[in-house]
């Protein structure tokens, strides 16, 4: 293939997991991973990571990580557009590390700088006895694979509770999407911005 007829397009993502708001908790850290479709492949960067532990300041209720993100994907089509899954952990009353929140968001479609705030949630026990037992044993309900957060299967039967927010900042660059017929320019009429150029007259 020549450079005039590319077979793939590139999505370059960098930015940071900036901060979190969990009013009831302190001394938290986060893990992240990317979830993407079968036609997508990472070409450089890290697919997953774990941050440092952060504490609230005297005058601030925010937990600041400023944890860097940097990854590049290649794909032949936008189906299965990458999502980032963030899991937040911290100590409970007994000093055990327990999950404080899960959340996911799609990587922005349009090039440029974007800020996203993810509402976080935690799975809950289905009965009071299970709640008491899990609190006593220090084993709260959690997903065995956090990537399930970005997928729909089985989510409708999971009992969850909203808890906190995480803010991420993205810098997005795309390459060769226009050459493959995809327009990612932001317009007022299509906020997602991901439409076939051939459909626009």
Curated annotation (Swiss-Prot):
One of its GO terms (cellular component) is ciliary transition zone. Keywords: Cell projection, Cilium biogenesis/degradation, Cytoplasm, Cytoskeleton. Coiled coil: none annotated. GO terms for molecular function: hedgehog receptor activity. It is found in: Cytoplasm, Cytoskeleton, Cilium basal body. InterPro entries: C2_B9-type_dom. Residues 9-126 form the C2 B9-type domain. Part of the tectonic-like complex (also named B9 complex). Belongs to the B9D family. This is B9 domain-containing protein 1. The lineage of its organism: Eukaryota, Metazoa, Chordata, Craniata, Vertebrata. The gene is b9d1.
